[in-house]
Amino acid sequence: MLQSYISEIGRSAKSYCEHTARTQPTLSDIVVTLVEMGFNVETLPAYAKRSQRMVITAPPVTNQPVTPKALTAGQNKPHPSHIPGYFPEFPDPHTYIKTPTYREPVSDYQVLREKAASQRRDVERALTRFMAKTGETQSLFKDDVSTFPLIAARPFTVPYLTALLPSELEMQQMEETDSSEQDDQTDTENLPLHISTDDSGPEKENASVLQQNTSLSGSRNGEENMIDNPYLRPVKKPKIRRKK
């Protein structure tokens, strides 16, 4: 009830204040409010000067604990004139520093070479460890096998086989000679076709016999050249092509 009474005094005083085009109520506004509410204003001085009144002491002033400031870098920016003083201060100057989120690519030749060499060394080391763990290894020390493992050397089953196999150059030369011989055979087979049709009967018979003989010789040469075993083939000199 007391709270509602005080609230009504404040609301009425505020309305009288605004009615007179003011923003803050004065003592006269409160007196008019009390009179309108039916309160005798003349009894207030006698009530205030009574002997058995209760004196309310002011609350003790306590010093607010000072919060320690964090590490500051630089001097904070002061508030402009349009910002009230009870607003918090501006943050430290390092708050506004821009920090790029990407790194510039390294373009120094020496740094790139060192980085490539270290990556290559790491790859070789990782591959060596993988081969040592998955395959057969040899150790430098007889007592401790796990120290300094080396990849075991695997000898060839037939060590003399590499000396007997022809090299790539010899295979290429053999293919060139085979292709040149086939071209010569096709030229000799197509030779009787250029004989004119106006020849007499004996000439046609001789041409047919010559064609049969060349075909038989070509088939024999082809059979001789088609040898599966490369070690049994006859030695052929490479054909030297002259530049035109």
From Swiss-Prot:
Biological process per Gene Ontology, one example term: transcription initiation at RNA polymerase II promoter
Biased composition (Polar residues): 208-220
Lineage per the UniProt record: Eukaryota, Metazoa, Chordata, Craniata, Vertebrata
Domain of life from the UniProt record: Eukaryota
Transcription regulation in keyword set: yes
The keyword Nucleus belongs to this UniProt entry's keyword annotation: yes
Primary localization class, coarse: nucleus
Molecular function GO terms recorded: protein heterodimerization activity
Motif (Nuclear localization signal): 231-244
Stated name of the protein: Transcription initiation factor TFIID subunit 8
Ranges of biased composition (kind: Acidic residues): 173-187
Region (Disordered): 172-244
GO cellular component, one term: cytoplasm
Keywords: Cytoplasm, Developmental protein, Differentiation, Nucleus, Transcription, Transcription regulation
Pfam families assigned: Bromo_TP, TAF8_C
Subunit structure, as described in the record: Component of the TFIID basal transcription factor complex, composed of TATA-box-binding protein TBP, and a number of TBP-associated factors (TAFs).
PANTHER family: TRANSCRIPTION INITIATION FACTOR TFIID SUBUNIT 8
Assigned protein family: Belongs to the TAF8 family.
Protein location: Nucleus; Cytoplasm
